[in-house]
């Protein structure tokens, strides 16, 4: 529980202000003992993270400061404990956050000295107190004195109390959840009761651990409070059992001394610092709240706090014990049952030994707190939050009796040792060993210990008592141990004798029984902050139980038992990391018959309906207002689980949380309940359904509808909650998860019945031994089978037919186990139970999407869980939310994480993780499923012949055929392979040679291989031995992947099933085929997931550009549809239209284009830029086809803004555009063009309009169709889509541009050749290559570089007087004839380059389209962006800029416009307006590794076989592309571990499951570090190993190509690094070379494109010549 809540509840839930009457001035309810992540909590589940950070920082400072002083191993091992403990002292001193901050700002040393001094004093006092037992035991006179009015009474004359003030600073976790002063309010009779000021028995070790407090207890017990005066008693409390035992472990020693003159001190470890902040709680009265006896008896005798004969005990105030009673037996050994009562007075407490010792064990909520009806009574103490204790006077002659008798419930007094409930804990392995060692030290000693709380002081019959307390071995060996309360309750709100409220047994069957209760952590959580134990070997805190003979029952090996294997969930405010408390019942437990009656139903209804009332509204947010109409109001809910040990405030808070959780579950049930109205077994289900319908639509904050505001509050919190420790949300999720997990554990050969329709499934509620009711409706569990990997079609595994027995533990609930367990009835008689089971986890109507934030952790479940730990597993969070399938009748509200996702997983009935969205078909309706299956069998996209062939195969299906498409074997298109030297594509089935691995693999066509006459071949500067070459044939085929349905076990293609292998969880995810899915939907067993369950195109981030294009597109489509409707004389609804379109920008990144070196050399004197910055963008169009968003269109653009240098300033380059022919509907517009074409044109026009508005002046388009068999963006086009010729493609662009011209978006159209290579009309611009816009991937930059190299080679050959290998070089005479006057130096090279380039471009000049968005000057050809434009009205398309106009005015009239004419035309100025001064992009950067370049996206598609050649594949590929877009950090490819050669599954965090130490990301970070590290003794992990690999790489002769394993490993990491590295000056070895290699690959692609264009032009010229 948190600080804020502790103080709040302690006051408000008792009807009083929070009490701060505690020792040392410490505030109420500190949270310093909680785990760090649970400290300083304010509000409902909210964390004061700032305060938490401050405290953690202070701990670190203390740790560092002390660590510098000491360096021994033993000291450093204990240092974290000491640092935490010292910080807790400081926290006690500075409770306020502001004070704490001021303290932190100062030096740490003075504060540390104070903390150390306080801690030393506490340890010293602890040692002194160990010598006190005889003194205290002998001082009996004081206890009979009546305190004098007005005089504060002290328990002893000892002046040790000054330590009390200082030693309060170290409470244990949860310690501060109770007011540490016992004065919690005035008594009802007006008396001021005694106040027992107890120093928090936290971690101080200053509290007496032996007899001191015990003697005081007895004395105080006999004191009579004087009316009107405060009798205060300052008594230190033993810290060793502050974790929940709450009694003095020295007490049994005292008793033993008095009887046998023997003393066994309970704490010998004061020399060391123990129990640092890990205890559950420390307020002694809170200890008593949770227990009725020191060792777990529900109604055991509590005498003087520790078995002191004649001493009476008054229970403390329990402000939150609304569902829990403390069962107190009579004093002495009287077998009479305790009469119990409740009244409705505010609670208060009389100082009794309880206040000091808290001698009862802690029970979780409801364990000792047996539920009862309104009128149930309890002797002398009224613990519920709405009752007050009547002031009572007890002496050692009086038994406890009721002051206001009420109808009673007689409780069975368990005064025999064999009926005691001993509390144990789940132990970590280390703690078990240490505790066993401690136990072995004391097994040979007489153990009189804490069981004496149930004995008489004198133990007249020790032997018989010992024999009675011996645990039967069969009881110890039971995997399900019980600690039930054998109390029979009345029918009002109570369970019948066959269904007792008890705690689930611990999972540890063979743990020795230790004294009281102490804390531990769950085995799998022991790394988190929790209970810190001292050296158990030196402490005698842990003793065996009751007798000498019981020693033989203690096992020598404490082992963790996984028989229960239950998931325990966490309640905030309980033990750190929710230490599970288990109660052992040392009785023989046998199976008892259980009748199939409606008792469980009644209990569930009581759980969910009964809302306890409070006179103080602040006590329960869900008190009276949360009662459902007609629900019975009782003083205690009948089935609340036991509160973990935490005291009054903790008990109150957990009830507070628990009720919220139960209400939340009830809302879930009502929301998903499918039963007819009035027939649901929850008779108030209909009213809650009405409430749900109301508050889901209600927007009023002050709505007066019953429970509306509170219901909305809890559901909204659930939606937004990302706290894995939230006591409400996390528990609700885990309950539902556990419900499905329990269902999945049952694998009977036939459907079995677990109960009638009214039976409830009990689910573990987090603290071991606690249960909570979750309703499961009857249904069938199908036979399940071991999980089969989904990727490969393997031999089927037969389902398990092993019959499972259902165990009935002592819980009234039905916890499914594989073993029998015993259920004691009310008379402690036993019977045997064996029953068939049947579970119907009904599906959700609306599955929950729970977002946990990025890289966060979420609970999941799996099968292989380490023994002893709960099945709470942490899984790496992906970035896409997958809704949870609870497989129960509960449903969860839909929560959408606006950031990236996390993955919520539950366990399905088959035992596999049920991951939502593993198949897109889960979102389909049955009609959409049928539409999808019909579409599969049409083979849309294939040629008519292939489609008919596949359809024919479908008519002849066999058992190996896909159940959906009816075809057996389908293969992917093999990725294209290119020859490394020549760049030619290696044809299908052609032979080739290969060498190398990974990205360094090279391919050689047969001609290139044969041309090399030597023994080696040089490629990219590397020589490869021919002997190492491997000859292959390009005929490899990859078959489509398969997936098997977990229901019907039929096989389908993953593509047909729209199965996402990335969510397959390593082959463990459950998959339901479409056929079974439809059947389940028709039977009402499940509902289709909402469309938001799997993130789609609409969930991609929107940008200004995408919105602009979409707005224009939708407006134009609406107008087009209206025109068609008008033409056909129909309404607009009667004509089909394009629907489901989404435009998104998926990549928008800044890049730099480096100018090629040869070209730069020519213009270096002209200050030509070395690089051009630009922004690269990728735009995609999606359309929802048959329920799936299919990517139909994509384009890449380059934007060179105003900041870019000339000649690229304000220019845009449309670099690539691609589409596939699946657009729907396939109709034509009014103008006769295809609607598909209309849409694509509007996207381009919208983009040009957007560019013009931003201030760009021109757009450049190279209308170049792809090569046959190659793709630009989308991989593998359908056969029905023809690749256009260049003229068709050019006309396609020009028709679009003509539309844009009509809208005045485009002002001029020209081509690259006419604009730059010749001077036409009055153009006065210089013809030079420096004016050409320089774009990445364009035709001319690459061609110019090749030409420069060729010109240089020719020049070298001419100098050597050799004939040129190509045609003769252009002479200067020819250049002069062409008009070039300056032929000196680089100018001649420029002229020759332009001449040669012009000759190449001229035949295809129309393909290089120049689009002017602004007017260009007719003289200088500059695009005008400011000033005035001078226009000639007589001449068409003549405009000049201000600069040229000024120059024009300096000329003579005959030289002015128009030139070569006698006429003079007047120029009119036109202002250039509406053009922004810059081209700043308002959109944010959008990075996508997969869309960074079109080659990167192609590589993604090729490597994963994301093909678009058929509609079925296009749908699957688009689904996967969207998955990658929404999960950018998920690995793109399945990577192979270089150590074990196993695949590293995607989504596994780049980890190899076989090699646990291999983490790829860490290795890449290490690579960067090692490349710059110069330290010979670097401590960075594995730094020297990587350096050794570097040295090996320089010396190795074998190399990676030769098979060297070390070289392969290094190359693999270097390649991965180079892909992601953006640093041009990176120091990682070979990084630049690898980048250059990648650049060459892109250059090869560009070269192939140019070569194909040149070949096409050559063929065209040949055709023209032939026709002539």
Swiss-Prot record:
Sequence ranges of Low complexity compositional bias: 459-469
One Pfam family of this chain: zf-TAZ
Binding residues for acetyl-CoA: 1217-1219, 1236-1237, 1292
Binding positions for Zn(2+) 2 per the UniProt entry: 1432, 1435, 1457, 1465
ZnF (PHD-type) residues: 1002-1079
Reaction(s) this enzyme catalyzes, per UniProt: L-lysyl-[protein] + acetyl-CoA = N(6)-acetyl-L-lysyl-[protein] + CoA + H(+)
Uppermost EC category: transferase
Compositional bias per record (Basic and acidic residues), positions renumbered to this chain: 886-899
Residue ranges the record marks as coiled coil: 1342-1365, 1630-1650
Chain's role: Acetyltransferase enzyme. Acetylates histones, giving a specific tag for transcriptional activation.
Official protein name in the record: Probable histone acetyltransferase HAC-like 1
